[in-house]
Amino acid sequence: MYTIPFQTFDWSSIKKEEHPGTTGTSFWQIFFVNGLRIRRVEYSKNYLADHWCTKGHIVYCLEGEFVSELETGEKFILKKGMSYVVSDGLSSHRSSTNDGATLLIIDGNFLKPVLADQPA
């Protein structure tokens, strides 16, 4: 169980980290709190992630449009106002965008799969 007291934070005060993709660049602003990683991520035009991600996320598209491609070949177009969720170790995925996008991404231990003999 997580205990997170009420708090605010200003994204404009959080430094952007640059993460080059196969093409384009992503810029991450990260806020950590009690086992959660909350990120505001901006994808540049023509961005393609440089790896298949196996981490779980809750993703919300704040601006623009991007494609979430699964390692199986399935592709999902997410536009402003759309979300997806996936647990750790399921559905390896990567992102791409032609025109850029801004996302809110939340991940942490709560997205780890529960084993059959463990209580939920």
Segments (PLM) and residue ranges:
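Short acidic-glycine-tyrosine-enriched beta hairpin
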Residues: 72-89
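A short, N-terminal "cap"/entry segment at the start of jelly-roll beta-barrel domains
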Residues: 1-40, 120
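Conserved hydrophobic/aromatic beta-strand scaffold that supports enzyme active sites
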Residues: 38-42, 58, 75, 83
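Short beta-strand segments in beta-sandwich/barrel cores
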Residues: 48, 65-69, 83
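Ligand-binding loop in jelly-roll beta-barrel domains
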Residues: 88-114
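Short histidine-centered beta-strand/loop micro-motifs
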Residues: 48-54, 70, 94-96
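Conserved short histidine dyad/triad with adjacent acidic residue
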Residues: 34-53, 87-90
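Short, conserved beta-strand element in jelly-roll/cupin
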Residues: 52-68
